[in-house]
Amino acid sequence: MTQLNRSLLAAASVFVFLTVLAPAAMPGQNRGPEKPLAAPSGALTVERVSAEPDADERARSLHWSPDGVRVAWLQLRQPPAKSRGEVPQQEIWAIPSDAPPNAPPAGPPREPILLVSAEKVTASLRGSDAPRHRRLDDDDDNSNPYLLRNFAWSRDHSSLLLIGAQSLAWFEIATGSSRTLVSGDQPLSDAAISPDGKTVSFIRDHTLTLVSVQSGAAARTLLPPAHEDILEGELDWPYRNEFHLARGYEWSPDSSRIAWLEIDDRAVAKYSLRSSNGESREIVSPKAGGEIPVVRIFVKRAGSGAEDSPVEIDLGPTKGLYLPRFTWLPDGRHLAIQRLNRRQQTLELILADAVTGKTQTMLTEKDQYWINISDDLRFLGDSKRFVWSSQRAGFRHLYLYDTDGKQLAQLTHGDWEVTHLNAIDESKGLVYFTATEKSPLESHLYSVHLDGSGMTRLTAMPGTHEAHIAPGVASFADFYSSQTTPTRLNIVSLDHPDQTAVAKTSSGFSAPGQSPPSLLPVEFLNLKLHLGAEAHAFLIKPPAFDSAKKYPVIVYLAGGPGEQLVRDAWGGATGLWMQLMARKGYIIFGLDNQGTAARGHYFEEPIHLRLGGQEMADQRDGVLYLNTLPYVDTMRLGVCGWGYGGFLVVHAMLDRPVPFKAGFAGAPVIDWHFYDAIFAERYLDDPVAHADGWDASTALENLSPTFFKGSLMVAQGTEDEVVHLENALTLQDRLLDAGKSADFLLFPDRGHVIEDPPSRLVLFSRMTDFFVKNL
């Protein structure tokens, strides 16, 4: 890569298309120091960074009790540092909310209690008949069949279903006793309790299986065995990871029927993942332009036998189509099914009769770019009206429809996004939702009447609120964080949201047993890009900052669809690593380019038919802004990112105008032909009809000996199911052909996210050392 000549650097300060509109700090957020900062107190080391949980780890596992009185979640307990052979185990913690549902809180907030200890979890999942000792080779989750994956409340909220990798146990809270429901050495997944609380369902051997809670009778399959590539109620990798479908089957509200998705992967391409011991396993990996799964939906009475025929829902020919969502209506007879064409530009919402299989289309959405699938569909109790979200006007908003497809009301309006439809309280005529109305950098809980009137914000603290509303819609669990506040859980009454929380965590959800260190302030910026769009960015400056000095800069990249780097939220381990590097004397800079989330569909559209182009143009504008700052050392620019961010890092290191000296790329996509069809075709369309866009989107477009002069390190898990190892190998092969090379940090048998503590420590240590050495 050629160095950006000094005349261009000098000219950058007069580029009128790149101006700072505001050093706009969030309300309550420090705008940045006017005089040098003292060094922050509190130890911040690589070990401390690697111990920090992912920012949303606890929120994913949260479950309200059916009576809406207690909320519980998983929390990982690490074994003592000097223990041998002991692996981490999940515990279940809970917060009781003893206040009457509609009463204001009184007295001090309630503190969390340990509901099920790690020892009890392990004993319950192991069962009396299983071996009590085994060899443990590492801390990877897959090596521990007794690790708690999830849990569910019983209908009477007196017990918990403990869900392991191979076993299910029924745990009685009052006595602390448990009994085994399902055991064995074969994996199981997607366990759930029927709405009437009498049956547990799960997937084993690619098919639906049921077991009685009371009798503990032998598990029975709802369907006969099928071909190993025909999944009955089980999700394949694309549907689980690209459409984020929670489960491949659903109980009817009265527990009389089960609807499931049949996924036929027989014609779909497979990819082989090879472990360090020479064993291999295949995963379904539909490639662009190739075959995609053939999907159908069936319904069957829960009490029927495997030999009884199910009802097939009449969706017409489904080859070349996706069915990304389906759900029951409250009446227990009808299903709502979303049908999406392969180009992902036409989405139909279909009403299906579960008894006859007949269907009718309720509404159709069309978009010339692509349609983003969401979970925003809730039916009212009469099963004749529903709330639905759409981005048809450029921003996602809520609409009230009837099942004949008539729009009854538009509930929300404005140049902001509804990010989640939380709940409907029909008794009050209120819809609860999460949105960016206050700022794209924040998210808050709101309510609005079913006629679209009286929109009210229910959360006050500046930052990010992720609300989980309780059954009965009396209170909500609020996962709150900001750039300087680790994630905390508060339980708040919906009738008194401005009052003190009725319950809260005492120390937040930071690393167990560790207080968060004091942090350097984050300055939020609004930058106007060269084509007129406005981008959000942030700066973190070193302690004792002196504007008369020159500082190196690390540009952190995320940049992909659905991602948002610049937001007032706790950043987890990555955010702490940025703080660590700032303490070491680096300025940290991040910018959300066009194509990222929370700014509306208009802001996403410029990446259509070309990935990496608009994103890098916007990131170059960010660098040009940095060049206007007198305290930035323009010859010492580094870049770092993971996944899509890693893809952009490789682009950046080969980008002709910008002289990045060092780049750290985690799991970078090198060629989108290697990626799964659902994601790649959504943005690039057909690889034959739009071959030029596909070719231009490769990270190696500008590779040549002339344009690669910096230091590049690539980190990759060898069993990464998202970004396959062939990407990293192709990059190194092409670099060698050009007479160049990159440093590679391989994590054997690890996936896309490096999760086990020893490997996380190595990852953050190598990232840190790489920039200290090369920048």
Give residue spans per PLM region.
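Bacterial N-terminal signal peptides that target proteins for export
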Residues: 2-13
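Absolute N-terminal positional cue centered near the fourth residue
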Residues: 4-5, 29, 770
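Generic detection of intrinsically disordered/low-complexity segments and helix-coil linkers/edges
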Residues: 9-11, 58, 67, 147, ...
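Beta-propeller folds
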Residues: 17-20, 24-469, 474-475, 483-485, ...
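Serine-hydrolase catalytic core recognition
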Residues: 269-270, 324, 332, 338, ...
